[in-house]
Amino acid sequence: AASGNNPVRSIAAGAGLRYVSYINEALVNGEPYVQLKTGEWMRASPSGYLTFQGLAFQKTPPNDFGWMIDRVKARSSPSFNAPEVGEEMAQYSVIQIYDIVESEGMEWYMIGPDRWVPYQKSRRVRVDTTPPQGVTGDRWVSVDLYDQTLTVYQNRQLVFATLVASGGAPFYTRPGLFQIYEKKPLETMSGAFEPGKWDYYYLEDVPWTMYFDQARALHGAYWRDWFGVPGTHGCVNLSIGDAAWLYNWANQGDQVYVWDPSGETPTDPSLYGAGGA
């Protein structure tokens, strides 16, 4: 009952996320309750989700591009000591990248005349229509763990690009060449990885799930409010709209190339379990 008396079941305790799908909501004594698809009620607060979406292309762009992942002003040269120029750019603003230099321990991107932004605040899509080593067909998905981007290629043309969130240490997304082996429009995901299972999470109706490496999958993440930074248990999180686009494009058997141009992601197989959301 919505009053909280006589519970019929429970979701395991822990510090991880808890999300359920609901069909109705109500306030009882000022407390929010939602009705599950099973007819049961539970105390929970409705949640929104990020509406960011990537870019689809009819032809491959001529240069690299990317997104700002934070609000920031450009600098007149590639240095944090250089004067700020122009207006503050909003998070997820699209940028064109015309030059790249190493300065002060990171990449800096020239996004216009005398306008530079650091990797710390932006992410780059490396446009490369050459199939990665081992890719045998004319369709593939590339996941860049350093830049936290996903690109989709067909007939050696870039057709889609977006920001993602991949596995955070020590739950990295494993580099390698894989194939999508199962697609599910909705999936319930749960798990715990730490001793004592204090990090248990439970996620209902995870949308547009495409498994490619054991329990690691490409999927929508309605709970995530920041893309462009790692932080999953090994899956590759996309916005809801991006996951839907990819799910509709992808076929079972399509190849997924996961790589880290910085070489920082471990490749030792003993460091990788089955993965998770």
Identify the function of each model-found stretch.
Residues 1-3, 32-72, 110-140, 171, ...:
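Boundary regions of SH3-family modules and the immediately adjacent low-complexity/disordered segments
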Residues 81-88, 93-175:
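Cell wall/extracellular polymer interaction/catalysis modules
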Residues 3-47, 87-123:
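SH3/SH3-like beta-barrel superfamily modules
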Residues 25, 39-41, 47, 100-102, ...:
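Solvent-exposed coil/turn segments that connect beta secondary-structure elements
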Residues 2-8, 78-85, 240-246:
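Short alpha-helix capping/helix-loop boundary micro-motifs
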Residues 76-77, 150-152, 187-191:
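Short, solvent-exposed loop/turn elements at domain surfaces
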Residues 130-136, 140, 160-163, 168-177, ...:
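Exported/periplasmic cell-wall-interacting domains
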Residues 29-30, 68-69, 104-105, 143-148, ...:
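A short, compositionally biased
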